[in-house]
């Protein structure tokens, strides 16, 4: 019984011959399919959080920390939601000034 070696294929790249095994080819394709790290989210703190900041500070936190710790305890709010609330309040104040005149 003979031991079979993985076959290799030769490719020319910049006039160099490179031997690529099927395992290397599959690993190279899987490398791009791995999950990328999730970006940090910017949050506004509702009250003081130890090691993070004081009330009113805008901080960057990971999605998991916000979802599992800050959001259930109502210690932080998303900045995007805050911007939309400010816009809504500004529209309401413009409406109230128009009705008073």
Curated annotation (Swiss-Prot):
Name under which the protein is recorded: Large ribosomal subunit protein bL9m
Assigned protein family: Belongs to the bacterial ribosomal protein bL9 family.
UniProt keyword list: Mitochondrion, Ribonucleoprotein, Ribosomal protein, Transit peptide
One example of a Gene Ontology biological process annotation: mitochondrial translation
Location in the cell: Mitochondrion
InterPro entries per the UniProt record, alphabetical: Ribosomal_bL9/RNase_H1_N (IPR009027), Ribosomal_bL9_N (IPR020070), Ribosomal_bL9_N_sf (IPR036935)
GO molecular function: structural constituent of ribosome
Highest taxon of the lineage: Eukaryota
Entry's Gene Ontology cellular component terms: mitochondrial large ribosomal subunit; mitochondrion
Transit peptide boundaries: 1-32
Function: Component of the mitochondrial ribosome (mitoribosome), a dedicated translation machinery responsible for the synthesis of mitochondrial genome-encoded proteins, including at least some of the essential transmembrane subunits of the mitochondrial respiratory chain. The mitoribosomes are attached to the mitochondrial inner membrane and translation products are cotranslationally integrated into the membrane.
Subunit structure: Component of the mitochondrial large ribosomal subunit (mt-LSU). Mature yeast 74S mitochondrial ribosomes consist of a small (37S) and a large (54S) subunit. The 37S small subunit contains a 15S ribosomal RNA (15S mt-rRNA) and at least 32 different proteins. The 54S large subunit contains a 21S rRNA (21S mt-rRNA) and at least 45 different proteins.
